[in-house]
């Protein structure tokens, strides 16, 4: 029994393992180019069966714990390997040995406590390596990266346990485009640890405290282009002038991201700008200033300028003690050389006039997403403010009057580019005043409904996108670029209003078509973006757009941006792919052809009817239908005649002088119905024939050549054909007055031809001795 249980347990383990392997294989999806995606699929190991066809493998965000030297040995062509956000705690020595073509390796956010240089010794082609977020304390006992000559991006460290940087750590690295070091708890930095790297384009340092920051700066200041400091509290930062005062610096840009300052540490940073003379650009992003701006007490006035800083960017600056903040007058003298200033999302409602006047070199000012209004703008754009300002961005502030805004900016004599988008103007006055050199104006997302002559005639670029405009009828003789997307325009603007227009963006309106003539009317048009409209794919429109190869060079969003909205059977299709039927595109020709065909058909029908007596058949059909509406057989009391006689007018002598004498003067007499005397005057002759036959017990047909040629005899015979012969009775009596060639009987008298072949008929004898027998037989036939 225990043996059986043991066997069952072994088989269960094998089956579950096979199911797990099958599940993992099915969880990995690969496309024909060798890109395999297995991220976020709860994998606990690297799937088996990987081949040399795999070029990119994404296994991030799984539960993989172990990488063996067999997992990837066949992936010799692998270039990208993503193993981030797993539970990897062990990587065997030769796990990546066969990946000689690998260029991108991500091992971030795992549980690696020790790093080994043997992992990377064969990765000569590696360009990107991410080791962030693991639990190691150091970068190993030997140089990790000495075998990576092509490495350009390196990310190392973690936020908790990484505490030491040693001189050997970066040995072998000569040039890096980006180096990111996460060392919030860094305790030991051995001098010259980063000095071995001769050139670093961008260094990102995550440091909680600035204790070792100056030591790091000393090593990199001569080989670094851009330094980015993240998540750092600079409350205790102190800049040592002697440390770098005599060094050749190459740093051009400083970025502070999520950094905390005090008044004191801010002054220390300003000192740094003076001594690192190469700094041209400074950026503060999502930083906090824990102070009140009392820089005068900190001897800031002894600093004459900000070094060579030309560009200053501040985004999302937080000042907890904002209402206690000083007037910043102590920093005014430092701003004389600054050319570009951006202050976004920082609750700026006023730039003091005195500060504006000190910004004598300012050419670009961006105050987007702040609280500027016309009242405060009046103080900011005071006399002599920003004398060389060319570009002013006031996007998403609290401006409401377009007329007043233009008047307030008249002091800016050199202003040529104004962005006042995302303000709530609603309407536009008929006339406005603007600085005389205005060339670019952005009024997008301002909720305006119409455009007026308020716009300056000197404009070369105008953006009125995302408004409520339904027309454009302004004359702007110098306008070169028009951005008017996401409005309610139904057609392209009139080209005569815009004679030098070269770029037009008009997507997302309700335009349903445009023509070659319209585009040709813009002689200098080089780029048109008109996608996202509700195009009616008419034949002319499709012929124009699909037949002009050069059009693709003008339509910048062709072909994917152009979709049909009508007709319904091509709705949603790309204009380039839509096809219409011949009848839709050449309706007049098709209608003409159909009319011609109908005419020919009618003509052919008429010829055939004449040739095959079609009209006669129609008349007979009508007569038959008339007869159908009457009882099949008249009641006995309605029978008025013993026989109806159908004969030709040319045979009337025989009928009236011989037949009538022999039958009506016989005893007992027979009552005959003759059309000459018994038809009702004024009644339609067809109805007379039908009524007479129905009121007669028998119908006598006097057949002769004249009978066959008689029109009325044909009617009488054919009615009998429909009414009497189809009843399979003996109501019809045929008298052959003279011999008739059966071939002379028309084909339409098929019933008569058949009867003459199958039924006995009475033949008028020319011998007088036989005529008495003829009359005797005729009387007997009538009585039967």
Curated annotation (Swiss-Prot):
Cysteine disulfide partners in this protein: 30-36, 353-382, 432-454
PTM statement from Swiss-Prot or TrEMBL: Ubiquitinated at Lys-754 by PPP1R11, leading to its degradation. Deubiquitinated by USP2. Glycosylation of Asn-442 is critical for secretion of the N-terminal ectodomain of TLR2.
GO annotation, biological process: cellular response to diacyl bacterial lipopeptide; cellular response to triacyl bacterial lipopeptide; inflammatory response; innate immune response; toll-like receptor signaling pathway
SMART domains attached to this UniProt entry: LRR_BAC, LRR_SD22, LRR_TYP, LRRCT, TIR
Keywords: Cytoplasmic vesicle, Disulfide bond, Glycoprotein, Immunity, Inflammatory response, Innate immunity, Isopeptide bond, Leucine-rich repeat, Membrane, NAD, Receptor, Repeat, Signal, Transmembrane, Transmembrane helix, Ubl conjugation
Residues annotated as domain LRRCT: 525-579
GO CC term, one of those recorded: receptor complex
Molecular-function annotations in GO: NAD+ nucleosidase activity, cyclic ADP-ribose generating; transmembrane signaling receptor activity; triacyl lipopeptide binding
Ubl conjugation listed as a keyword: yes
Pfam families, per database record: LRR_8, TIR
Residues annotated as site: Interaction with bacterial lipopeptide: 349
Extracellular-side segments: 21-587
Cross-link (Glycyl lysine isopeptide (Lys-Gly) (interchain with G-Cter in ubiquitin)) at residue(s): 754
Motif (ATG16L1-binding motif): 761-778
Family: Belongs to the Toll-like receptor family.
The record's note on its domains: Ester-bound lipid substrates are bound through a crevice formed between the LRR 11 and LRR 12. The ATG16L1-binding motif mediates interaction with ATG16L1.
Function, in words: Cooperates with LY96 to mediate the innate immune response to bacterial lipoproteins and other microbial cell wall components. Cooperates with TLR1 or TLR6 to mediate the innate immune response to bacterial lipoproteins or lipopeptides. Acts via MYD88 and TRAF6, leading to NF-kappa-B activation, cytokine secretion and the inflammatory response. May also promote apoptosis in response to lipoproteins.
Subunit structure: Interacts with LY96, TLR1 and TLR6 (via extracellular domain). TLR2 seems to exist in heterodimers with either TLR1 or TLR6 before stimulation by the ligand. The heterodimers form bigger oligomers in response to their corresponding ligands as well as further heterotypic associations with other receptors such as CD14 and/or CD36. Binds MYD88 (via TIR domain). Interacts with TICAM1. Interacts with CNPY3. Interacts with ATG16L1. Interacts with PPP1R11. Interacts with TICAM2. Interacts with TIRAP.
Protein name: Toll-like receptor 2
């Amino acid at each position: 029994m225990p043996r059986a249980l043991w066997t069952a347990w072994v088989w269960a383990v094998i089956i579950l393992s096979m199911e797990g392997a099958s599940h993992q294989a099915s969880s990995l999806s690969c496309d024909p180019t060798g890109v395999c995606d297995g991220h976020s699929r709860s994998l606990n190991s690297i799937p088996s069966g990987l081949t040399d066809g795999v070029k990119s493998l994404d296994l991030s965000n799984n539960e993989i714990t172990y990488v063996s030297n067999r997992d990837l040995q066949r992936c010799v062509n692998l270039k990208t390997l993503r193993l981030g956000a797993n539970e990897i705690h062990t990587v065997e020595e030769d796990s990546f040995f066969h990946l000689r073509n690998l260029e991108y390796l991500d091992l971030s956010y795992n549980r690696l406590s020790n790093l080994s240089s043997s992992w990377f010794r064969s990765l000569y082609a590696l360009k990107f390596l991410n080791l962030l977020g693991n639990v190691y304390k150091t970068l190993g006992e030997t140089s990790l990266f000495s075998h990576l000559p092509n490495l350009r991006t390196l990310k190392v460290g973690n936020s908790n346990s990484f505490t030491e940087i040693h001189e050997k750590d970066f040995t072998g690295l000569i040039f890096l485009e980006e180096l990111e070091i996460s060392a919030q708890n860094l305790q030991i930095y051995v001098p010259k640890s980063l000095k071995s790297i001769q050139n670093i384009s961008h260094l990102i340092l995550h440091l909680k405290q600035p204790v070792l920051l100056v030591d790091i700066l000393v090593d990199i200041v001569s080989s670094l282009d851009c330094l980015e400091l993240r998540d750092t509290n600079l409350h205790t930062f102190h800049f040592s002038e002697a440390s770098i005062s005599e060094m050749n610096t190459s740093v051009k840009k400083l970025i502070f991201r999520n950094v905390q300052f005090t008044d004191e540490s801010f002054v220390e940073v300003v000192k740094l700008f003076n001594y690192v003379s190469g700094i041209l650009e400074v950026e503060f992003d999502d930083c906090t200033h824990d102070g009140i701006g009392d820089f005068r007490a900190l001897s800031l006035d002894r600093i004459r300028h900000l070094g060579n800083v030309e560009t200053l960017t501040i985004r999302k600056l937080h000042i907890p003690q904002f209402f206690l903040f000083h007037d910043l007058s102590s920093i005014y003298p430092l701003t004389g050389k600054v050319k570009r200033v951006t202050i976004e999302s920082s609750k700026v409602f006023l730039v003091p006039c005195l500060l504006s006047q000190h910004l004598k070199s300012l050419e670009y000012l961006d105050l987007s997403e702040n609280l500027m209004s016309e009242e405060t703008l009046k103080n900011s754009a005071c006399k002599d403010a920003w004398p060389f300002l060319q570009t002013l961005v006031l996007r998403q502030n609290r401006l409401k009057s377009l007329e007043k805004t233009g008047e307030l900016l008249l002091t800016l004599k050199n202003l040529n580019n104004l962005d006042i988008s995302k303000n709530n103007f609603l309407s536009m006055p008929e006339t406005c005043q603007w600085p005389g050199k205005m060339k670019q104006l952005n009024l997008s997302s301002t909720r305006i409904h119409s455009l007026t002559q308020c716009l300056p005639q000197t404009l070369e670029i105008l953006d009125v996108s995302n408004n409520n405009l339904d027309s454009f009828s302004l004359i702007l003789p110098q306008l070169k670029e028009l951005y008017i997307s996401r409005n309610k325009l139904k057609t392209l603007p009139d080209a005569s209003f815009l004679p030098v227009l070269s770029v037009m963006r008009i997507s997302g309106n309700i335009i349903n078509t445009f023509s070659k003539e319209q585009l040709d009317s813009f002689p200098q048009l080089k780029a048109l973006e008109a996608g996202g409209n509700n195009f009616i794919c008419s034949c002319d429109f499709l012929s124009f757009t699909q037949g002009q190869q050069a059009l693709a060079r003008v339509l910048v969003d062709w072909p994917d941006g152009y979709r049909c909205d009508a007709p319904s059977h091509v709705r949603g299709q790309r204009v380039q792919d839509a096809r219409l039927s011949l009848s839709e595109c050449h309706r007049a020709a098709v209608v003409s052809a159909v009319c011609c065909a109908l005419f020919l058909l009618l003509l052919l029908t008429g010829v055939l009817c004449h040739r095959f007596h079609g009209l006669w058949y129609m008349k007979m059909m009508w007569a038959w239908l008339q007869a159908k509406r009457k009882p099949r057989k008249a009641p006995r009391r309605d029978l008025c005649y013993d026989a109806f006689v159908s004969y030709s007018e040319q045979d009337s002598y025989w009928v009236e002088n011989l037949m009538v004498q022999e039958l009506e003067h016989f005893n007992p007499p027979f009552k005959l119905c003759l059309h000459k005397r018994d038809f009702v005057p004024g009644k339609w002759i067809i109805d007379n024939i039908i009524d007479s036959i129905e009121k007669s017990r028998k119908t006598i047909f006097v057949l002769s050549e004249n009978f066959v040629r008689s029109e009325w005899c044909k009617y009488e015979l054919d009615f009998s054909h429909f009414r009497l012969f189809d009843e399979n009775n003996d109501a019809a009596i045929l008298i052959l007055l003279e011999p008739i060639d059966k071939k002379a009987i028309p084909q339409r008298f098929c019933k008569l031809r058949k009867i003459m072949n199958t039924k006995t008929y009475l033949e008028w004898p020319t011998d007088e001795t036989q005529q008495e027998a003829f009359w005797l037989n005729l009387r007997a036939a009538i009585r039967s």
